[in-house]
Amino acid sequence: MKDLKKIESYLDKLRIKEKDGEERKIYAEVLDGRTLKTLYKLSAKGYITAMGGVISTGKEANVFYADGVFDGKPVAMAVKIYRIETSEFDKMDEYLYGDERFDMRRISPKEKVFIWTEKEFRNLERAKEAGVSVPQPYTYMKNVLLMEFIGEDELPAPTLVELGRELKELDVEGIFNDVVENVKRLYQEAELVHADLSEYNIMYIDKVYFIDMGQAVTLRHPMAESYLERDVRNIIRFFSKYGVKADFEEMLKEVKGE
């Protein structure tokens, strides 16, 4: 009962755009009191001006739309909230423990989630600085990450898999080349490997955007080469369905600049 009262208290403090109570109900169902407190702190700091609807929900994270402010300008935000209570993060250990940027000694499950949130922010920041097409990261706090919303009118841009047959109406070869160029830039300039790249986490709206950057690793990670090969195979496999022909060895060399 006490936790429920806390949730109601923070929901009262947060501005939620929809007036019919449906969004409020969803917030109460998927977010715990600690996370709502973090959202309120980000709101009090001036980052979030109004929370909007649910973009996606999952075992690891929920993503919401929000109106916000960054560098003194109004922006459309995606608010990614990692679940503190989740067993899914055991699967993420290989991406964390091989990353020299983080000290993983004596880490509790909750702290692991916080480190993962920081890791995604830092990966986005590093990729953006290198010219990779990713959402602009704004800030993070505990298990909450604020970044650029990719879409229009509060509707997220589709992923390549969501485009489905519509992809045939577009310049598939051009989109493929855009993906390859961004993988290349991510590797050569940002010195990162996405490590989970597929049609499920590449958005498209006039150009491609790589998302879900939490698992991305540096080139010094012991599995970086293996992850890169998997990413390249995934890209070739998907685009082959639309008539794009690419050689694995040649593409791998192009990405690595060999």
UniProtKB/Swiss-Prot annotation:
Keywords for this protein: ATP-binding, Hydrolase, Kinase, Magnesium, Metal-binding, Nucleotide-binding, Phosphoprotein, Serine/threonine-protein kinase, Transferase
Phosphoserine, modified sites: S108
Residue ranges of every copy of the Protein kinase domain listed in the record: 49-258
Binding site for ATP: 55-63, 80, 148, 150, 200-201, 212
Catalytic reaction annotation: L-seryl-[protein] + ATP = O-phospho-L-seryl-[protein] + ADP + H(+); L-threonyl-[protein] + ATP = O-phospho-L-threonyl-[protein] + ADP + H(+)
EC supergroup of this enzyme: transferase
InterPro entries associated with the record: Kinase-like_dom_sf, Prot_kinase_dom, RIO-type_Ser/Thr_kinase, RIO_dom, RIO_kinase, RIO_kinase_CS
Keyword Signal: no
Pfam families: RIO1 (PF01163)
Reported function: Autophosphorylation of the rio1 protein is not necessary for maintenance of kinase activity. Prefers ATP over GTP. The yeast ortholog is involved in ribosome biogenesis. Despite the protein kinase domain is proposed to act predominantly as an ATPase.
Family, per entry: Belongs to the protein kinase superfamily. RIO-type Ser/Thr kinase family.
Name the UniProt record assigns to this protein: RIO-type serine/threonine-protein kinase Rio1
Gene coding for it: rio1
